[in-house]
Amino acid sequence: MEVLKVSTKSNPNSVAGGLAAIIKEKNIVEIQAVGAGAINQAVKAIAIARGFVAPSGRDIVCVPAFTDIEIDGEERTAIKLIVQPR
């Protein structure tokens, strides 16, 4: 499964484009985000990507979960958003 890492500084339109391309190619993608700002950007990107794939008759859903990741040698809890067609 392809993993996209989103930060507070990520451009939602850019993330949405990548997300839509991966959904079309592989049918599933995982987005990882740490912190409220990053999660906000990720959710905006999912909403934008839904608009990108809708004209082709597809709809996407998002399943949230927690995951532990390592950043600079430190364990952090992240939100992972599994995005896939409905």
Residue ranges and their predicted role:
Residues M1-E2, R86:
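Low-complexity, interaction-prone regions
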Residues E2-I28, A42, I46, R50, ...:
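Conserved mixed alpha/beta catalytic, RNA-binding, or beta-rich assembly cores of soluble enzyme
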Residues S10, V34-G37:
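Short beta->alpha linker loops
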Residues A36-I60:
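Short, hydrophobic/π-rich interface segment
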Residues A54-R86:
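C-terminal edge-of-domain segments
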